[in-house]
Amino acid sequence: MQSRKCENGLNFFRKRTTILHFYTLPAVALVISFQTLLISCVEHRKFDDNTVIVHMLAEPKGLHPVNNNDGYQRMIQQCTQKKLMTLDLASGKLMPDALESAPIIQSDSLSYTCVLNKGMRWDNGKEVTAADAIFSIKALVCPGIEASDMKSIFANVESVDADPNNPYAFTLRMKKKYFDNANLLSYVVLLQRAFWDPNDLLGRYNFKQLADETITASFQKQEVAFLNAFNHPDKARVANQMDGLGPYKLETWNSGSEIILKKKVNWWGDASVLPQNQNNPERIIFKVIREMEPLILALKREEIDFTPELSAPALLRLQGKSGFNASYFSGITNSFSYTYMGMNMKPEAGRVPYFMNRQVRRAMALIMPVDEIIAVITKGKAYPISGFILPGQADYDPNQKQLQHDLEQAKSLLTDAGWTDTDGDNIRDKIIDGKRVPFSFSLSYMISPVTGELVQLIKNAYYSVGIEIKPEGLEFSAFYEQAYAHKFDAMLGAWSSSTQPEDPRQIWHSESWSNGGSNFVGFGNAYSDSLIEAANSELNPAKRKMLMHEIQHIVQDEQPYVFLFNATRKYALHKRFGNDTLYRERPHIWFGALNTDTK
């Protein structure tokens, strides 16, 4: 589930044209002509090496296999790591990755027996065994290891034990029945125990002990040193400090520019025919380009092989060029991602409680000009949504209706909640703790080619009813650091999921707020938590769907998010790979399967 600039000569002249527009028309024509000449004379890339270049709008915070968890990290991890189970991009279903087959579920529906593929080897030549898998699972719950999201996801695991008769087998036992227990295995990235924990310190503790946060009180110097080493920033960025089972390894990370992966020599899976094990390119470069103008120029120069992150205007502009169409497949593919505005329902001390009142949150949803946003920002290439489960997902409720834009109702709700303009400055205000407070909140967002325009459109809409928005643009990692720390008034974010049944615990359970998880806004109470727990323990799909529908209705009624739209992916894929098969599931393509020998 889940899960999401630079200047150059071209951009410089575009900005200069805007300035010169206010002076003389000949000057404008001169600059435009020079810009056109610059574009028409771009030097194309030479395809003399077996390299695939993939575009990213931002770089990940890190590539730590446990502690980092964002869309860009997972995209690169597809090439460098192996999970016990992984998502089949074509079918949207789980399939074995490091396991030889799907886990065997025992009759009690609580025990899952797993057997690893034989013959998998680490970079030092050592064979992968169940000891590595058990260490990998323990690391996800160990106090002091910085994987807060994983701790809530693995809260249902009671034990993990090796098979004394088979060095490749182990059994997970769950505390209680859970609708998607097997899906937990898709979160387990295999770690080499000898590399990460050479003294086998976690081997001294069973799973139950490690799942207890108080165990840290008994940790000695050795354990503290292990935690510091495990969490060290070098383990997320420095090539020789990283280890993985995938067909590629980190060669170079040029911060803010590119991440270069190199194909491993004599990799254990070279003979595999599975799509996730293909390693056709010698190198895969993940190149960071944050703005559309430089990206457009890079595509004209054929410096990018694949991007799923074109804006709608950029795609339409490129598709109007015959040279681009001759070199690239391009189009739109659906996704399981949505954009939202989250409102802080539990602000920290000292922060104005703008959104603790449900009427205010509903007013915010009624003000949001969703149809205009879709028309202007996405050029009609997105879909309005009513909640966090999207069409095509298992528990989608087709009867849940989207809220309609209604400024008059919004104004009435704001007035009823005490927000009125008492001083005639066109901004509503309210007496809070004896002080007049203007409705002037900060909206944090991740800087990207489209969010600036989107935020300005939103800002104008809310100002029309007496609410001031103060935009706060942040880089990718800073944005999510702020979100996890709950240090925001409102945030413009996005979640990505899959066809797999949704576990609402990660985003909507109150524990995921208190323990630093992904419930950024502080949604939830005892009743909604109980519904989430009931849905997660219900093995009957029809009964579970009813519970999930009720959870969706509560979320819509409480309005912690203003749901904006289900995004589509605007992509370009170089034709030298011979086909344009893209999948709805992220990252939409198996990078190692791209065959650069096809001309």
Where are these regions (language model features)?
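N-terminal secretory signal peptides that target proteins for export/translocation
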Residues: 1-20
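Bacterial Sec-dependent signal peptides at the C-terminal "C-region" and cleavage site
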Residues: 34-50
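Extracytoplasmic/periplasmic ligand-capture domains
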Residues: 41-46, 90, 117-148, 159-163, ...
